[in-house]
Amino acid sequence: MKRPVGLLYSADQVPPPSIVLFSALQHMAAMAVTLVFPIIIAREAGLSAAQQTDVVSLSMLAIGVATILICLRSRFIGSGYLCPAGFTGIYLGPSLFALHLGGLSLVLGMTVVAGLMQFAIAPLLRRLRPLLPPEIAGLVIAIIGLSLAVLGVRYSLGVTESGAIQPAYCAVAGVSLTVMVVLNVWSTGFLKLFCVLIGIATGYAASMLLGLFEVASLAPPEGVGLLHLPDTGHLGWSFDLATLVPFGVAAIAATLRIMGDVSNAQRQDDAEWTRPEFGSITGAVAANGAASAFCGLVGSPGINSYSASVGLAGATGITSRSVGYTAGGIYAALAFVPVAGAAMVSMPAPVIGAVLFFVSAFIFTSGMQMVTARMLDARKSTVIGFSFAMAVMADIYRDVFAAAPELLKPIFDNSLVLGTVCAVLLNLVMRIGVRRRVRLALAAQELEREAVERFLFENGARWAARRDVVSRAVFGVVQVLEVIGTPLG
């Protein structure tokens, strides 16, 4: 393992307490963006303001426990890398479908089922490896980056229902994003480490100046003290086979996403990274499944690794999992502090947009690096290209896909789910006719270098092998043939 240039603290290192704390706060601010998904579910379910506050508090507990589980380093569960958790749009479509079909209890019950499905998939990952190759994981990461960028632009522009853009939102997002980029690119030390946190603070200040944020919004609901045990009276669980397919697809998409995120975390920690280490990935998927089941039990929608935080870790150079433990522990503790929940959900929309847009650049490029590290023939190019195009179309032509059958809407409503499903299915189809073993016969007096190179490179692309591996294979084969036969001409 070789330490990458720009990595300040690796997964196994423990930074000074001050750096751990500020890094954890930075990740917590980024993760707070995902609390919008439980809020959407709570509002769609028609819960009261007090119940919505309880949902946010319970969701903070869930996100804290999930982060600790995924970052944990153990033999059976956890990734061992800084891979914080966050609520995800993957489960939003299936959850809304279940909500309209059977209410909040069906959402929570099927979230538990989806978590158990993901937990059951974990030990089978090695056998499923041919169906989930690294280039597919890279594609999923790239789609996630693109999705975050689209969402970030929407928040930054403050687009209204009529399609109008709000100048104040653009100003706040522009100031916040500029601070993040300038500090990340042209500064060093403390300023570079906490560029996102400083950008967020700047965004809050700009929002207050332009009237987009008021400190009074941080006040807890009337009658609620400083410490408050969330009420669980609104919780219930039910199950319906009609929602099994959408939640199953979401579980598979969540599995691919965390596989990609952990692979990205591994790559950020090792300059000589070549392929995913499946022991770590298996533990991460098991942790994610257990975390999603826990979310369903405490009244939250499904959860997943948070790609933005993985990208944030790479951008700041701090990948220590102790940061994840700290962020998770603080989140779990703040679940019992109502004002903390209000602070998390009151972040101005343009500031959220700036954070999403900033980290999307690192996520997208990481995914594309994983894809382009492999040799791609016509089959693999078709899988990657078609799947990426379908994911883009899901965002551009959302109104068109809204006409899909009700059972398929959870797939077509989400670009990540649609792109993932297309990639997995196309990969299965394109494997037809691909042989695991191939042979090239050469005449003793006609050992041509070009024929050998062409044979190895064509099959390397068919198998999506890394270019450096194929190049070494070509060199080795050529050397052997030069020894046992006529020198290649």
Model-based region annotation:
Residues 431-475:
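Bergerat-fold GHKL ATPase/HATPase_c domain
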Residues 1-14, 179-182, 196-248, 403-413:
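Hydrophobic transmembrane alpha-helices of multi-pass solute/ion transporters
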Residues 18-34, 166-176, 194, 210, ...:
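Hydrophobic, membrane-embedded alpha-helices of multi-pass small-molecule transporters
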